[in-house]
Amino acid sequence: MNDIKMAALGALMLLAAWPAQAQPADPLARGRYLVESIAGCGNCHTPKGPQGDLPGLALAGGQVFDEPPFRAVASNITPDPETGIGRWTDAQIARAIREGIRPDGRIIGPPMPFELYRGISDNDLAAMVAYLRSVPPVRNAVAASE
């Protein structure tokens, strides 16, 4: 099974077990839980080395998925204004997560959007956006997907 299908399957299994009522009162805590656990954003957006996640590059993108006919490169989703999502509005970040659309209207491309992310509640989506805004910005320019 290729990496993209494995990531999608993992996200599907986690979302299927997602408790509807178990939401922390703190949106930032909820966002952290969703980004780091349930949605598994770091599985694609944190670059990996032989020993696992590369230190200091959490959510900074650059991981490559060569799955012909696509070559997907995970984007930097830290709030860095030059190489990440720091200049995006909250609505643009939410649209990218839910619909896979960039601020300029282009499709992000495989594997985003995960079809499952379309069903995220507005509150959970806002919590994810708030959390992504709170992580340390990491300057890490990545290549475009092909």
Residue ranges and their predicted role:
Residues I38, G84, P111-P113, V142-E146:
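Interaction-mediating elements
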Residues L12-Q21:
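Hydrophobic h-region of N-terminal signal peptides that target proteins for export
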Residues R87-G105, F114-V142:
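C-terminal capping alpha-helices of c-type cytochrome domains
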Residues A20-E36, Q51, T83:
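Electrostatic cytochrome c docking/interface patches
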Residues M1-A8:
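Bacterial N-terminal signal peptides that target proteins for export
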Residues L28-G42, I120-D122, A144-S145:
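Sequence context surrounding c-type heme c attachment/ligation sites in exported
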Residues G31, I38-K48, I93, M128, ...:
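The canonical Cys-X-X-Cys-His
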Residues K48-D90, A94, I108-S121:
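Gly/Gly-Pro-rich "capping" loops immediately C-terminal to redox-active cysteine motifs
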